[in-house]
């Protein structure tokens, strides 16, 4: 079981990704966090070949590792729950990129919608 403090809970939203109501807990990343992820996703060892696909995959893995704080309803084929961890995010991307691609799409689209709404409210003074 993972415990979340009040600050994390306030900034985190549950995002349903699948028809069975399974999904993830995620938060909006700051521009600084996104910039850091962009730089890290472009950093390679000397023996690695840099490709746009690899940089994109690295960005998405790092984004999910930073934005997610947990998930509900994700199970292995035998029905046992998949434990949440940063390592598991990377491992799942390696073995089931379609699943993680769906999760990334849900998270990025939902959080960009929330961020746009927050920016609109802050410009109009609705949060004052």
Give the residues covered by each predicted segment.
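Short acidic-hydrophobic surface loop/beta-edge motif
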Residues: 10-20
